[in-house]
Amino acid sequence: MRSRNQGGESASDGHISCPKPSIIGNAGEKSLSEDAKKKKKSNRKEDDVMASGTVKRHLKTSGECERKTKKSLELSKEDLIQLLSIMEGELQAREDVIHMLKTEKTKPEVLEAHYGSAEPEKVLRVLHRDAILAQEKSIGEDVYEKPISELDRLEEKQKETYRRMLEQLLLAEKCHRRTVYELENEKHKHTDYMNKSDDFTNLLEQERERLKKLLEQEKAYQARKEKENAKRLNKLRDELVKLKSFALMLVDERQMHIEQLGLQSQKVQDLTQKLREEEEKLKAITSKSKEDRQKLLKLEVDFEHKASRFSQEHEEMNAKLANQESHNRQLRLKLVGLTQRIEELEETNKNLQKAEEELQELRDKIAKGECGNSSLMAEVENLRKRVLEMEGKDEEITKTESQCRELRKKLQEEEHHSKELRLEVEKLQKRMSELEKLEEAFSKSKSECTQLHLNLEKEKNLTKDLLNELEVVKSRVKELECSESRLEKAELSLKDDLTKLKSFTVMLVDERKNMMEKIKQEERKVDGLNKNFKVEQGKVMDVTEKLIEESKKLLKLKSEMEEKVYNLTRERDELIGKLKSEEEKSSELSCSVDLLKKRLDGIEEVEREITRGRSRKGSELTCPEDNKIKELTLEIERLKKRLQQLEVVEGDLMKTEDEYDQLEQKFRTEQDKANFLSQQLEEIKHQIAKNKAIEKGEVVSQEAELRHRFRLEEAKSRDLKAEVQALKEKIHELMNKEDQLSQLQVDYSVLQQRFMEEENKNKNMGQEVLNLTKELELSKRYSRALRPSVNGRRMVDVPVTSTGVQTDAVSGEAAEEETPAVFIRKSFQEENHIMSNLRQVGLKKPVERSSVLDRYPPAANELTMRKSWIPWMRKRENGPSITQEKGPRTNSSPGHPGEVVLSPKQGQPLHIRVTPDHENSTATLEITSPTSEEFFSSTTVIPTLGNQKPRITIIPSPNVMPQKQKSGDTTLGPERAMSPVTITTFSREKTPESGRGAFADRPTSPIQIMTVSTSAAPAEIAVSPESQEMPMGRTILKVTPEKQTVPTPVRKYNSNANIITTEDNKIHIHLGSQFKRSPGTSGEGVSPVITVRPVNVTAEKEVSTGTVLRSPRNHLSSRPGASKVTSTITITPVTTSSARGTQSVSGQDGSSQRPTPTRIPMSKGMKAGKPVVAAPGAGNLTKFEPRAETQSMKIELKKSAASSTTSLGGGKG
C-alpha cells in the first residue's frame, strides 16, 4: 500500500530529474488531492453500491490511460509526469475509500475501548477514521488498562499505608500511656517531696525554737558570768589604779625631794662661789684703785708737760712743712725747665745721629772713589764742625742730668721726713683720746667701788643665812638617802617586771605572727571556696535553666496530649451515641421477633385445636381437613423459613451496621491518610527537587543536618538525664559546701575580731612598756639630779593633759538594701543561712568591753531578731541619729580669739587661747602650761622627758546614768550603756578601705582611740516596758594629778573626725558637721559659737542626747539636720557648782544581721514594718529623724583636790 508521502517523494524525484515541469506536476497534484478530499466527503454519505461504482469508474479511466500509454510509447517526459500524477491521485482516492470502509466496519466495543464511551456512534466513527488517516495505523490501545493497573497499585499501597498507620497509632498509644504514667509518677514524687520539705521545715522550726531557748539560757548564763567578771575586773582595776597612783605618788614625791635637794645644793654652791669670787674681786679692786690713783696723778703731770711740748713741736713742724713745700715748688719748676731742655737735646741728638750716618756713607763712597767732589768735601767738613759742637753740648746735658738726680733724691728725703712727722702727730692725738677715756673709767670705777662695798655687806649677811640653811639641808639629805635606798629596791622590782613584760611582748608578737599566717591561710581557703562556690553556682544556674526548658517542653507535651485525649474522648462519646442508637434498633428488632414468636405460638395452639377437632369430627371431614392441614403446615413451614430469613437478615443488618461504622472510620482514616500522603507527596516532590539541585551542586542537603541534629538532640537528652542525676548530687554537695562556707565565714569573722583584740592588747602593752621605760629613765635621771649639770640646774617640762568632748549633730538616713529574691537560690540556701546565723550568734565573742549593754543588748531587741530571719524582709536600717536640745549660751565675742585664764591653784594661772576659724568651721584651743617651779608648787608632777611637747586631745566618750522615765516618753526603744569620758591618746594608722567593720560611704578619720584612765564600773541597766534607762553625759576637760598609764581599748569613733590632735600645744576642734550641708541648712545659716564662761558663774542646765550608731557590715549615709546648727565651747572654772542633767532619749542599740531566706510566708503586719536586728558584739543600728537644733561642748578644768562632783554633758556615745 502506498502512502501520500511516497507520492511526494516520487514527485520530488521527478522534480530533481526535470525541474521545469515540476510546477505543473505540483499544481496537478494539489488539484487532485483537493478533488480526492471532495470525493471523500461526498462518498461518506453514500452507500456501498455508490462506492463500488466509483471504483469501477476509476478502473475504467485507468484502463484507458494504459491503453493510451501502450499506443503512444513515444510520449514526452511532461506527459509522463502528468500521467503519473493522475495515477497517484487515483491510488490515493482508492486508499481513502478503503479507509472509509474500514471505519464503517469497526465495532462499537472497539470505539468504547478507545474513547471510553459508545453513545455518539457516528461521531466516534468519524474520529476513529480521521485518527487512522492521520496516523495511518490501527489504534488498538485500551483506555481502561492503565487506570485499572493504577487502581490495583493504589489498593496495594493503601493497604500498606493502612498497616503502617495502625502501627504508628499503636506506638503513639503506648507512648501516651507511658507519658501519662510518668506524669502520675512525677506528681506522686512532687507530692512526696513537698511533704518531706514541709516535714523538714517543721523540724527546722522546732530546731529553731529549741535553739532560741538554748540561746536565751546561754545569754542569761553569759550575762551572769559577765556581770561577775565585770565586778571582778572593776575591783582589780580599782586596786590597780590605787597601786599605780600610790607608786606614782611615791615616784613624784621622790622626784620632788630630789629636785628640791638639787636646787638647794645648787643654790648653796652658787652662793658660796659668788661670795669667794666677790671677796677676791674686792681685794683686787681696792689695791688697783690705790695704784690707779697714784698713776693718775703722775699721768696728769706728764700729760701737761707732753701737751705743751707737743704743741711747740707741732708749730715748728708746721713751719718746716711750709718751707719744704715752697722749696719743693721751686724744685718742681726747675725740673719742668730741665725736662724741656732734655727733650730739645734729644731731638738734636737724633739729628746728629742722622748726620753721622750720612758722613759714614760719604766716607765709604770717598774710600771707594766714587765721588771726588770738592763740594761734598766741604759739606763733610761742615758736618764735622757741627758734630764737635754737639759733643760739647752733650757734656752740658750730662751735667744737668746729674743735678736733676740729686734734686730728686733730696725731694724724696723731704717727703719721707714729712710722713714721719704726720704719723707722730696722729699718735699724739690717739694718746690724748686714750687719756680722756682713762679719766672717764677712773670716775666709773670710783662709783663701782662704793657699790661693791655695799654689796659686800649684803653678801656677808646672806652667807650667814645660807650657813643656817646648809645645816637644815644636810639633815634632809640624810633622809633622802634612806628614801633612795628604798627606791633602788623598787627600781630592781620594776626592772624584773620589765623583763617579764618584754618576754610577754615577744610571745605576743610571735602569737600575732602565727595568727596573721593562719588568717592569711584561712583567707586563701575562703577565696578558693568562694571561687568554687561561684563556679558551682554558675553550673547550678545552667542546669536550672535547662530544667526550666525541659519543664516548658513537658508543658507543651502535656497540652498536646490533653488535646489528643480530648479528641479521643469526643470520638468515644460519638461512638457511645452510635452504640446507643444501634442498641435501640436491636431492641426494636427483638420486640418484633418476640411478636413473631407469639404469633407462632398462637398458630401452634390453633393447629392443636384443629387436630383435636379432627379427632372429634371423625372421618366425615377427613379429606378437606387433610388438605387444610397440609396447607396450614405449608404455611407454618413458610413462616418458619420467613422467621429464619428475618433472623438472618437481622444478623446481616447488625453486621452491616458494624461494617458501616467500621467503613465510616476507615473512610475517615483513609481521608486523613490521603491528606497525609498528599502532604508527603508534596514533601517528596520538594525533596526530589532538592536532590536534583544537590546533584547539580546548587543546594546543600538537609537530611544530613537533620540526622546530625537528631543525634545531637539524643546525646543532649542523655547528657541531660545524666546531668539531672548529677545535679541532685551536686545540690547536696553544694548544700554541704555552703554550710562549710558559712562556718568558715563565721570562724573568719571571729578570728578577725580576736586578731583586732590581740592587736589592741599588743598596742596597749607596747604603750605600757614605753611608759614604764620612760618612767625608769626619768627616775634614773632624777636620781642624778643632785649633781649639777652644765646649766647649773635641771628643769622639768611638765605637760598638761586634759580630756573633753565636742558634740556634733550628725544624722543619717538608714541605708536600705533590697536584693532580688531568686527562687532557686532561696530553695538551695534557706536552711544553710538559718543554721549559719544561729552558729554565728553562738560563736561570736564580745569585742568591746566598754559597757555591759554593748555585749548583751536588752530583751526588747529580740523582738526584732525574731522578725529578721524572714527572707522577704531584706530591708535593713542602719544609720546614726542624734537628738539634741539647745545648750546654754553666754554672751561673748566668737569672732575674735579670746584668752581665758583658769587657775588650777591660786597664784599659778593656766592660759587657754581659743582661736575660731569661721571659714573652715574649726576652732584652735591653745593651752600654755606654767613653769616647772610654779607647777611643782601647785600640783603633783607627771614625769615626762624634758624635751617632750604636751599632746592634748579632746574626744567624745559616753557615760551612763540610769534614770527612770515615764512610759509615755520612752518611744524610741531601749538605751545602751555609755562609758565615761576618759583621757585618751591617739595612734594614727591607715583605715582599711574594705572590711567588715569599715564604713565605706562616709569620711573616716585615721585615728585609733586608746584610753588612758578608767572610771567607776557602769551601772547595771534593767530595761522594762514601764521604765527605760536613759544615758546622760557631760564632757569635762580635766587636769588630774594621777598618772594614768594603763590604756584599755575603746571602740573606734569613725563617725566624725572633728578633732585633730597636734604636737604644738594646740587643740583643733571642728565646730559643726564635717559633711556637706544641704541647701536648706546653708540657707538658714550655720554659725559656730564659742562660749567662754567667767570665773564665778554657776553652770546652767544642759540637755543633749546622742548615740553612736554603727553597723560593721552596712554602709552609713549621713544626712545633716535641716534646722539651725550652732557649736559652742563652754569653759568653766573649778568654783562652778555641779550641773544637773535632765533625762533624754537615746536610740536603740542593735546591729544589722544578714537576713536569711525561707519559704515561710510572712504576715502583712510584718511586711509593713522594717525590722532591726540586734546581735551581741556587733554595732548599733537605729533610724530616727534628727531633732538637734544646737550642738554644745563643755570644757571644764578641775583641780586634783576638787570635791567628787558628777558633771555630765551632751555628746556622742
From Swiss-Prot:
User: Which portions of this protein are annotated as coiled-coil regions?
Assistant: 192-591, 624-781
List the disulfide bonds in this chain. Answer: none
Expression (tissue specificity): Moderately expressed in adult heart and brain. Weakly expressed in lung, skeletal muscle, ovary, testis, kidney, and fetal brain, and hardly detectable in liver, pancreas, spleen, and fetal liver. Within brain, moderate expression is found in amygdala and caudate nucleus. Expressed in skin fibroblasts.
Q: Which Pfam families match?
A: CortBP2
Q: Where is the composition biased (Basic and acidic residues)?
A: 61-70
Q: Where is this region: Disordered?
A: 1-70, 878-900, 949-976, 1103-1213
Q: Does the keyword NAD apply?
A: no
Q: Where is the composition biased (Low complexity)?
A: 1125-1138, 1168-1179
Instruction: Tell me the impact of changing residue 1133 to L.
Output: In NMDF; uncertain significance; results in decreased protein solubility
Cellular component per GO, a single term = nucleolus
Q: Which residue positions does Phosphoserine occur at?
A: 138, 979
Domain of life of the organism in this record? Eukaryota
Task: Give the record's keywords alphabetically.
Answer: Coiled coil, Cytoplasm, Cytoskeleton, Disease variant, Phosphoprotein
Q: Where is the composition biased (Polar residues)?
A: 880-894, 960-970, 1139-1156
Q: Indicate the impact reported for residue 386 to C.
A: In NMDF; uncertain significance
Q: Which disease is it linked to?
A: Neuromuscular disorder, congenital, with dysmorphic facies: An autosomal recessive neuromuscular disorder characterized by multiple congenital joint contractures, hypotonia, muscle weakness, and facial dysmorphism. Patients may also exhibit motor delay, speech delay, impaired intellectual development, and abnormal brain imaging.
Q: What does this protein do?
A: By acting through a filamin-A/F-actin axis, it controls the start of neocortical cell migration from the ventricular zone. May be able to induce the degradation of filamin-A.
Tell me, how does this one assemble? Interacts with FLNA. Interacts with RHOD (in GTP-bound form).
The name this protein goes by in its record: Filamin-A-interacting protein 1
Q: Which organism is it from?
A: Homo sapiens (Human)
